[in-house]
Amino acid sequence: MFIDGKWILREDIDVFDPYTLENIEKITALDREETKSAIEVAEKNKEIMKNLSPSKRYSILMKIAEQISLKKDLFAKTISIDVGKPIKQSKIEVDRTLTALKLSAFYAKELRGETINSENGLIFTKKEPLGVVGAITPFNFPLNLITHKIGPAIATGNSVVLHPSSKAPIVAIYLTKIIEHVLKQMDVPRGIFNLATGNGDIVGDEISKNDNINMVSFTGSVEVGESISKNAKMKKVALELGGNNPMIVLKDSDIKLAAKSAVKSKFLNAGQVCISVGQVLVEEEVLETFTKHVIEETKKLILGNPLDTKTDIGPLISPESALRIENLIKKSVNEGGEVLIGGNRQNSLISPAVINIDENNILSKIETFGPVLPILKVKDSEEAVSIANNSKYGLQAGVFTNDINKAMKIADSLEYGGIMINSSPTFRKDNMPFGGVKKSGLGREGIKYTVEEMCETKTIVIHNI
C-alpha cells in the first residue's frame, strides 16, 4: 500500500482489536498485479540503494530509530491494541526494536571483505547487496521482527518489499510513515522501501515466486515456510519457523528459579512466541516441588486488558485462536492430560493453563502457540533428551542444572539451534545467532548474522603483469 513513495488507500481488510473485538482499522489488500508493481519498483531502485554510501545507510537507520524513540509510547500502545500484548511487554518490544536498528546501523559501516595471499598477484573480496529483499513478518512481534529483517537489508544496501501480517498491520504502517519521512529528509528515493499489505496467499505468494526478489526472509508457520521454500526456487531463503521448545529441569537445579522461568517464559504474549516453552521435562524426584511452584507463580498472573499496566497476559490474536487452544486442551485431557489450573476461555482470552501430560500426548508433539504449559515426568536426563529430540522441531531448548559438565553434555546431545543453560528456551538477544534445525527453519537471524545472509561475496583477482 506504499509503493514508489505513494500511498494506496482502500478499505479492503478489517483489522480488529483482539481484546475488545472492535474494528479498529480498514487497510488495503494489494492484488497480485499491485504486488508485482511493488516488486518492480524495488527492483528499479536497487542500484540506487546499492550505491548509497555505508555512512548514508547508517544515518538512515539511526534516524529511523530516533523517530521511533520520539514516539515510543505511541508504538507501544499500538502494539498492544494491534496484537493484544500487555503494554509492559510492548514497551520492551519497542526498546528491542531500537537496539535492532542501532545494531543494523553499526554493521552498515562494518561490512568488509578480506585479502587472500597469492604469489601471482592480489586476491580480495568485497560484500555486495543481493538486490531486493522480500520481508514477510508475523503478528506476534509486529515491530521488532520487521526491523530484524529490514534493518540488515538497508544496512547491506538492498531495497525492500515488506509484507506484514494482515492480522496486525497497523504498526507496520506507522513504521513506514517514519521511513517515508526519513528517506524524504535524506533525499533518497522512496522506492527503495515498499509496503505491501494484504493477504498472504496473494502478496506473500507473489513475493516468494517473483524472479525480481533476490531473497525471501520469512518468520511464521512451518506450513507456510515450506511453501515459500518450494516457490522460491533458486532465490535465497531465510526461514524462522515454529518450535515445541523443551525445558529440562534436573533434580540438582534451583527448582524455584526454574519454575519462575517456566511460567514467565511460557505465558509471555499469551504463549504466542516461537521460542515459548513447549514442554517442561522434570526429573521425577523434584516433579512435585516444581509443579507446586509453577502453580503458585501461575496464580499470581493477571489476565485482562493489555493496556492496563498490571496485566500479565492479554488475549490471543483472535477468538478463533483461543477456540483452537480450548480444543487442544480438551484433546489433551482426552489423551490422559490432567489440567492443574486454568484453561478457561472467554472470547480471545484463555486463562493460563498448566497440564500434566506424558510423551504421547498431543501437547508434547505440536507447537501450541497459546498459554498452555505442559509438564512431563522423566526418570533422568537421558530420557529427557530422548523425548526432546523426538520432534520435528529444533528451535531452542533450556536446561536447568547446577552441574556444568552435565549441562554441556546435554547441550551437545540436544538437536536444537540454541541451548539456554539455566534459562528458558525463550531467551533471546538481538545480536546473538538465532534459528533452528529440522523443520524450525533455515539460516540464522540476529543482526550480524542476518547482515551476512543478505550479502553476496564478490572475489576480485589482480594478476601480476
UniProtKB/Swiss-Prot annotation:
Keyword NAD part of the UniProt annotation: yes
EC number: 1.2.1.22
Pathway: Cofactor biosynthesis; coenzyme F420 biosynthesis
Record: residues binding NAD(+): 220-225
Positions annotated as active site in the UniProt record: 240, 274
Alphabetical UniProt keywords: NAD, Oxidoreductase
GO molecular function: lactaldehyde dehydrogenase (NAD+) activity
Catalytic activity: (S)-lactaldehyde + NAD(+) + H2O = (S)-lactate + NADH + 2 H(+)
Name of a matching Pfam family: Aldedh
Gene3D superfamilies named among the record's database cross-references: Aldehyde Dehydrogenase, Chain A, domain 1 (3.40.605.10), Aldehyde Dehydrogenase, Chain A, domain 2 (3.40.309.10)
Keyword NAD recorded: yes
PANTHER family associated with the record: ALDEHYDE DEHYDROGENASE (PTHR42991:SF1)
Family label: Belongs to the aldehyde dehydrogenase family.
Function: Involved in F420 biosynthesis through the oxidation of lactaldehyde to lactate.
Assembly behavior: Homotetramer.
NCBIfam families linked to this entry: lactal_redase_Meth (NF040648)
Protein name as annotated: Lactaldehyde dehydrogenase
Annotated source species: Methanococcus maripaludis (strain C5 / ATCC BAA-1333)
